[in-house]
Swiss-Prot record:
Gene3D superfamilies: Amidase signature (AS) domain. NCBIfam families: gatA (TIGR00132). It catalyses: L-glutamyl-tRNA(Gln) + L-glutamine + ATP + H2O = L-glutaminyl-tRNA(Gln) + L-glutamate + ADP + phosphate + H(+). The gene is gatA. It comes from the Bacteria. Allows the formation of correctly charged Gln-tRNA(Gln) through the transamidation of misacylated Glu-tRNA(Gln) in organisms which lack glutaminyl-tRNA synthetase. The reaction takes place in the presence of glutamine and ATP through an activated gamma-phospho-Glu-tRNA(Gln). Belongs to the amidase family. GatA subfamily. Coiled coil: none annotated. GO terms for molecular function: ATP binding; glutaminyl-tRNA synthase (glutamine-hydrolyzing) activity. This is Glutamyl-tRNA(Gln) amidotransferase subunit A. Keywords: ATP-binding, Ligase, Nucleotide-binding, Protein biosynthesis. The lineage of its organism: Bacteria, Thermotogati, Thermotogota, Thermotogae, Thermotogales. GO terms for biological process: translation.
Length: 467
């Protein structure tokens, strides 16, 4: 069945995978709502992955394919160029069958903040798919595509992957070019693969990673993501932050699955130890000063002059104000206000300056722990997916990224791999490693995937979407 196929499965099939993908989208996407744009006409591409259908989050530019960022501001914007990661996928023959839904400008944790519609969780259509890469996660989990790209600023690849029961990988900052990724918070943003297996995530990393002259933050480091992926975890040492157990909102069933994962690690020959990471409790507050500050600067370009929405008013200032008020949704406006406030002369040092210092302290703490351990383990999210419309308080919403944010603030690689269920919805295990230790992080995730008691015939189960 196409919906269960991985990239490796596709390599041994002669069938028309693109049409199978488009038929699957046509059949179920009216219910799941993964896609903002579906691409029916494909380019003639050659390469080792020719014809394997993949989806792209709709804040990553695609030449001659609409790129909306889930916003009214860019609803009709069609870029004249491909993002570097998209160009590299095309060079290897991958077929882009659509652009996936997201929280507006990638600001959110549920895809409820899209200006167009809410993406639904394939495991239960009454629940969110997570965010901000919820469309990509749902498209992969429901079998509409074999794999997808997402972007991760504070957990936006890993959290929806956990909610939808798939693999989501955030690489080390600088490994994957951000050229063509519409900027939210430039020092935090990173593009990553969302797949049905850890090996597929490694395969995509082999394609998209690498130095790019169009992005000065990329590095020249050449990593081998596949050779050691089956090495296992025997003899490794894993750290578990004590702060995980002190978090009162940690769901009991999520905690139980996490304990099972730790026992699995020990059975496979790894040693698990608790450690103190005192600055981790400041991660969310630090993030919600730095990220909105960068967003307020990055989103200043959307003024109705060069491209995007323009609401004409008699005066230029009125045109700016009306355009931004209509074009941006409530959550985006909230973060712009917050960021502009923290960057103001009167409050810069008290908020933004202090947050940057705490960011450095947190990064130092994580690197100190990782000097003695192979990886840090946490749940990906403190809870499974929640019902659509059930969370209204912004603070509750922001705290859902409490375990994922530290990897972005420190630039470290981190992956979410499925590990069981809570309340009949998927749970993710997060593995965070040293900078540029991405291959080891993938190998650790592969061991958990391979030996998970929740595997079925060696595969992580996927949902049966009932329409």
């Amino acid at each position: 069945m196409f919906e269960k196929m991985t990239i490796e499965d596709c390599l041994s099939k002669e069938s028309d995978l693109i049409n199978l993908s488009l038929e699957r989208i046509k059949c179920i996407d009216s219910a799941v709502k993964s896609f903002i744009t579906v691409v029916d006409k494909q380019e003639e591409l050659e390469g080792p992955y020719k014809g394997i259908p993949i989806a792209i989050k709709d804040n990553i530019t695609t030449k001659n394919i609409r790129t909306t960022c889930g916003s009214k501001m860019l609803e009709n914007y069609t870029p004249p160029y491909d993002a570097t990661c998209v160009k590299r996928l095309k060079n290897y023959g991958f077929a882009i069958v659509g652009k996936t839904n997201l929280d507006e400008f990638a600001m959110g944790s549920s895809t409820e903040r899209s200006a167009f519609f809410v993406t639904r969780n394939p495991w239960d259509l009454d629940y969110v798919a997570g965010g901000s890469s919820g469309g990509s996660a749902a498209a992969v989990a429901s079998g509409e595509v074999v794999a997808a790209l997402g972007s991760d600023t504070g957990g936006s690849v890993r959290q929806p992957a956990a909610f939808c029961g798939i693999v989501g990988f955030k690489p080390t900052y600088g490994l994957v070019s951000r050229y063509g990724l519409v900027a939210f918070a430039s020092s935090l943003d990173q593009i990553g693969p969302m797949t049905k297996s850890v090996r597929d995530a490694a395969l995509i990393m082999e394609v998209i990673a690498g130095k790019d002259p169009m992005d000065s933050t990329t590095v020249s480091k050449k990593l081998d993501f596949l050779t050691h992926i089956e090495d296992g975890i025997s003899g490794m040492k894993f750290a578990v932050p004590e702060e995980v157990y002190k978090y009162e909102q940690l769901d009991r069933e999520v905690s139980d699955r996490f304990e099972e994962a730790l026992k699995t690690a020990e059975k496979l020959g790894a040693k698990v130890s608790r450690v103190k990471i005192p600055t981790i409790k400041y991660a969310v507050a630090t993030y919600y000063i730095i990220a909105p500050a960068e967003a307020s600067s990055n989103l200043a370009r959307y003024d109705g002059v060069k491209y995007g929405l323009r609401i004409e008013e008699p005066g230029l200032m009125d045109t700016y104000m009306k355009t931004r008020n209509v074009g941006f949704g409530e959550e985006v406006r909230r973060r712009i206000f917050l960021g502009t406030f923290t960057l103001s002369a009167a409050y810069y040092e008290a908020y933004f300056g202090k947050a940057q210092k705490v960011r450095k302290l947190l990064s130092d703490d994580l690197n100190r722990v990782l000097a003695d351990f192979d990886a840090i383990l946490t749940p990906t999210s403190p809870s499974p997916a929640f019902k659509i419309g059930s969370v209204a308080d912004p603070l509750t919403y922001y705290l859902m990224d409490i375990f994922t944010i530290p990897a972005n603030l420190s630039g470290l690689p981190a992956i979410s791999v499925p590990f069981g269920f809570a309340k009949n919805l998927p749970v993710g295990l997060q593995i965070m490693g040293r900078r540029f230790d991405d291959p080891k992080v993938l190998a650790i995730a592969r061991a958990f995937e391979k030996y998970s008691p929740y595997n079925i015939n060696g595969r992580i189960p996927l949902p049966v979407v009932r329409i």
